[in-house]
Amino acid sequence: MKIFIKTAAILVLLTAALPANAYFVTYKEQYYRLFHVHHIQYPEDSIENIYWLENAIKAPFANPLYALALIENEIQWEKYRYLFTMHINIKLLEQHLFLGNKYNKRHAFFYNAPFKEQNLKSLETAETCYRAALYYWDEALNWAEKANERRLRWIDLPRVQFWQDEAFRIEKGTLNYGRTIERELGFIKDVRERFEKMENHY
């Protein structure tokens, strides 16, 4: 039995000495690759994505050789950085909208009266998520404006064409999350007022 324990201990020590195939996540592009959307998005999925995307915002850019687009000169690199940051902010606001939607109560039904406090707390959580989304929308607008500057307008980055389309749609007003978020905040206000008027029974 003692020989078995010694052998097991030696194997554990040898295994610990072997190099692992892990790598450090350091750059924006690496964090962005960890972002993913599920067919059915649960709150913990949104929170995980928010974590990766917020780290992407804080992280430095990788060398242009490892960019998600083909970068051949400094002006392309500048536009790429603006588009990337805009896109990350859009994804962050979408994740906050998904998360807020899980806590949002669309209607104040009379039979929810006994759960009035829980529903009000849920509405508060949804409002917090929507207000965070509004912050990221403002950030996305700022970065889209930079990406759409006159001197960058004709710089084409085919591998991230979707990001360029987002910036163009923001400029033209066809992509307007601000309107969506304000509408949701208005709904929350109305539903909250109805819950607050309810008695604690039906």
PLM features: residue spans?
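N-terminal signal peptide c-region/cleavage motif recognized by signal peptidases
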Residues: 15-17
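Immediate post-signal-peptide N-terminus of mature secreted/exported proteins
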Residues: 20-84, 193-202
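Amphipathic alpha-helical repeat scaffolds of TPR domains
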Residues: 25-48, 79-112, 152-184, 188
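Residue position in alpha-helical solenoids
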Residues: 59-67, 136, 143, 150
